[in-house]
């Protein structure tokens, strides 16, 4: 069963070979835009044309009715002792249910790996190590907003999410420059909107923004808005020398010469962030190597008010795992199903991890 509520289910979410997405699942899709329910890139077994809030309220009422009628008969939750379990989860790999299978995958294929922390003393920091260093230090109920590129992709992959936290991303629905306005909006909402506070002490916590050196340039003027209103927004800036998503695409499909990337293409550059921070009145912190990450993160989080922490990361670290084209022996490029991601597993290992028949 796949239940999608208020999501566009864009190509970025279902994969380029979209006909293979959720091919063995019963798919329920809710959207307020009826045209989104008709697009050919998503197969829909049950379409629900409704406001997401109305649907969730109705579902909540149905669940309350089930618990009122059958609550005493329901088993205790394995993952949350003391609470009742309404749904045990579907079948997983042999001998496991779906939840157990997911836990096994997380342990077998961790996003942040020892190799990401193993860079040499003088090598640039690794973006996966940086994301882990930032997220592992945050408190419960804290809000994180991420921008585009590495912040969005690696943040979505490797962020350590704790109880009550919000992770706000624009993946597949917005352009570069989303970061600063989104952080300002989330900061304001967290102090004024009951849906963000939800009875927590969220209003007393600083907000974290993780963004990139390219994305932040698109709405740079909003740095003044943050300073002017003394918003407690901690800005972690991932500096990968340009537009890293475009860099990977060009390297994977075309090779050199690179065009419109950054320092390695030679035709594009960004201003010095330390000087910009000073111009806007921000305290500035930086980390250039993995060994400096912990101290830089600690100093940033302990600085009162808004602050910018620039982290200089390697330009050679690709996003992983990622949906990527495969090159066949005859040179043909094909888009594999979404579950078959780069770096690609061997045929034997893929077969061991499949619950439904595999598409080769």
Q: What does each of the following model-derived ranges do?
A:
Residues 48, 52, 56, 94-98, ...:
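Generic structural signal for well-ordered, non-membrane alpha-helical segments
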Residues 10-11, 123-126, 215-218:
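Active-site glycine- and acidic-residue-rich loops that bind
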Residues 4-5, 29-30, 48, 144-148, ...:
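General beta-strand structural signal in soluble alpha/beta enzymes
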Residues 1-101, 297, 301:
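Glycine-rich, acidic loop regions that bind phosphate or pyrophosphate groups
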Residues 40, 49, 56-59, 154, ...:
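Thiamine diphosphate
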Residues 68-123, 312, 325-360:
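Conserved acidic/glycine
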């Amino acid at each position: 069963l796949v239940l999608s509520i208020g999501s566009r289910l864009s190509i970025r979410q279902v994969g380029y070979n979209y006909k293979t997405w959720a091919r063995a699942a019963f798919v329920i899709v809710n959207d307020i835009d009826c045209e989104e329910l008709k697009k050919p890139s998503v197969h829909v077994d049950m379409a629900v044309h409704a406001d997401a809030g109305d649907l969730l309220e109705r579902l909540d009422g149905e669940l309350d009715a089930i618990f009122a009628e059958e609550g005493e008969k329901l088993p205790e939750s394995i993952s949350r002792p003391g609470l009742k379990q309404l749904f045990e989860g579907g079948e997983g790999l042999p001998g496991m249910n779906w939840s157990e299978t997911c836990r096994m995958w997380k342990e077998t294929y961790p996003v942040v790996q020892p190799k990401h922390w193993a860079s040499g003393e003088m090598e640039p920091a690794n973006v996966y190590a940086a994301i882990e260093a930032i997220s592992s230090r945050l408190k419960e109920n804290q809000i994180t907003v991420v921008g585009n590129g590495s912040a969005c992709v690696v943040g979505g992959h490797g962020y350590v999410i704790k109880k009550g936290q919000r992770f706000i991303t624009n993946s597949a629905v917005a352009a570069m420059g989303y970061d600063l306005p989104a952080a300002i909006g989330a900061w304001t909402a967290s102090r004024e909107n009951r849906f963000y506070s939800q009875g927590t002490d969220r209003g007393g916590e600083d907000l974290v923004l993780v963004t990139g050196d390219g994305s932040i340039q698109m709405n740079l003027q909003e740095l003044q808005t943050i300073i002017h209103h003394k918003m407690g927004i901690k800005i972690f800036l991932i500096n990968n020398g340009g537009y890293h998503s475009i860099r990977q695409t060009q390297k994977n499909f075309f090779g050199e010469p690179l065009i419109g990337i950054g320092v390695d293409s030679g035709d594009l550059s960004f201003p010095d962030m330390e000087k910009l921070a000073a111009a806007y009145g921000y305290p500035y912190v930086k980390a250039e190597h993995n060994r400096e990450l912990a101290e830089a993160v600690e100093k940033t989080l302990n600085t009162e008010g808004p602050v910018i922490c620039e982290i200089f990361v390697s330009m050679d670290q690709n996003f992983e795992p990622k949906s990527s084209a495969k090159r066949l022996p005859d040179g043909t490029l094909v888009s594999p199903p979404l579950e078959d991601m780069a770096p690609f597993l061997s045929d034997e290992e893929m077969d061991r991890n499949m619950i439904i028949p595999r598409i080769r």
